[in-house]
């Protein structure tokens, strides 16, 4: 009986040690593509485990050049995150005044990359941006407000300029 039990235990131990070798990353860091016309999710293995440590680690990744030359960091060199605050599920990020020097398209992509990256952290559902201690406004002076990952439409492929024609029969 002891031998059968020991063999069964060893078999279970061997099965536990086996895996398919494919470990997927729990997180993605969103980078800009080479042309700065879209964002690309790149798998990322975080070393941090706490919420605050993950926030800091993601800020560092978003501000650093990626390993792949096909991607660009979303937060430019001259833009600095001065502080952040976490109030429930809302992460508020404070940038210095240099944030306003970004081109319009790059700024929107930066926001999308930061928001989509940060909302992957458990407990963070939305993000708000402040620039020079004031809420971020768009080109029309309207406050941008709270942003969610779903606030940014993903555009698969090159469909932004595509036009389709069709003939319809109306009755």
Predicted regions and their residues:
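Bimodal "functional hotspot" detector
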Residues: 3-7, 13, 18-171
